[in-house]
Amino acid sequence: MARVKRGVTTHARHKKVLKLAKGYRGRSSKCYRIALERVEKALRYAYRDRRNRKRDFRGLWIQRINAGARLHGLTYSKFMHGLKRAGIEVDRKVLSDIAAREPESFKALVEQAQKALAA
C-alpha cells in the first residue's frame, strides 16, 4: 500500500492561516506558528466582540434617548414607562435615531409620554 504524504494539505492549511494573518506586524504575518496563535486569538476576540457589540449599541441608544428625554424634563426610565402606558411600541434603536435626527418628532413622543404618565 502506498504511503500517505500530507504535504499538499499541510501547505494548503499554512496558506489559509497566513492569508488570514495578512497585515499583521512582523513575524506574525510570515511564520506559520506565530501567525496561527495570532489568528486564533483574533478569531476569539471577534467571536466575543460580536456579542459585546449588541450590548454596546443598546447602551449607546439608551444614552441618546436619555439625553433627548432630559432636554424635555423627563428621565429615561419615566419616558420609557410613559411610552409603554401610551401604547407606543417603538424600539430603542429607532427612538435614539429620532432623538438624534428629528428633535421635533421626539418632542411629540415626549409629550405623549407625559400625558400618559399624568393620566
Curated annotation (Swiss-Prot):
Keywords: Ribonucleoprotein, Ribosomal protein, RNA-binding, rRNA-binding. Pfam families: Ribosomal_L20. One of its GO terms (molecular function) is rRNA binding. CDD domains: Ribosomal_L20 (cd07026). Binds directly to 23S ribosomal RNA and is necessary for the in vitro assembly process of the 50S ribosomal subunit. It is not involved in the protein synthesizing functions of that subunit. HAMAP family: Ribosomal_bL20. This is Large ribosomal subunit protein bL20.
